[in-house]
Amino acid sequence: MRHPHLADLALSFPALLFALAVPRPDVDPERAIACVIAGRPLAEAAAAAGLPLWLRKLPPEAFVRPIPPLPNGELFRRQIGNHLPRSPKLMPTWLQLVAEMAALAHEAAAVWIAREYLRAPKRDHMHLLGLWIWFSGQPGCFGRELIERPWTPAMKLDAARTAAFAWRANTTLHLNIGQRPIRNMWLNPGRVGDYEFRPLDDIPAIVEEAVVMRNCVRTYDDDIAHNRSRLWSVWRNGERVATLETGLHCHDPLLNIVQLEGPGNAAAPRELWWIARRWLHLHDLPQIETGRIKWRQAPLDLATWRRLWRPYWLAKRRIPDWLPLAPSRAAFAAL
């Protein structure tokens, strides 16, 4: 490494010098070193080292770890120069995020994160953002069907994070509930006077209730999966009037009414509470076992998990450790 041509790289191409001194595990630097010593064009040496030429614009402070594979498409090269960090302190993380987002999603997403990280230097939930961005461009995929607001390059980072979190909430609902109706609702549908109690026992019913009643019952999927909650819709004269949650309350071993609320979470009238209690007590409560599951121990739905992620695995030609083949609550929560 003590050749004058190599030393010249400190000024002409710091990234290449760093890559030769601290190569990636999958790159043998000897061919690139030979190119430099022989006076070959820098483009040839960079290609041998697996580096894009646009890295010439970055100073030595940008490199603190082996340089990961980076995007190098023609459009990317034209755009990335507009989003280079001015602060040397931001450069190592910025470079890592550009590489990561290109691998997670695509080059357009890498340009986007290069820009947005400079506006708002946040780097959490990159796996989630990358998945949401990738599925945003995959019409026909189940993962795309669950996206309410798809990614566009014009989005700000905070708006993208909000949309990605909403997508994760939708995917969580499907992973927790699965594709089949909930088998044990604990109670039976019934009628008391003019009021009818209908089970919210599958995803379409829960989502429809959330939309019509303007409430957040579609976020109750964790409680449902762990047998801590069941949801019911209360109707009168052919219209929804309230949403009812049943479960165990405090130290009471018998099934109880946990919540009863009208449209928009309005307080239910006293009369409706009495009707709901009468319906509840039509059942043999001491004989009902909810089968509560220890928190975070309920399995996610295997068929839904693989239906959701299979297109991504195939497109990327790998199953990453952070998105395993077997359903994992820990892996999903870490996104």
Feature names for model-found ranges:
Residues M1-L335:
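Glycine-focused motif/segment detector
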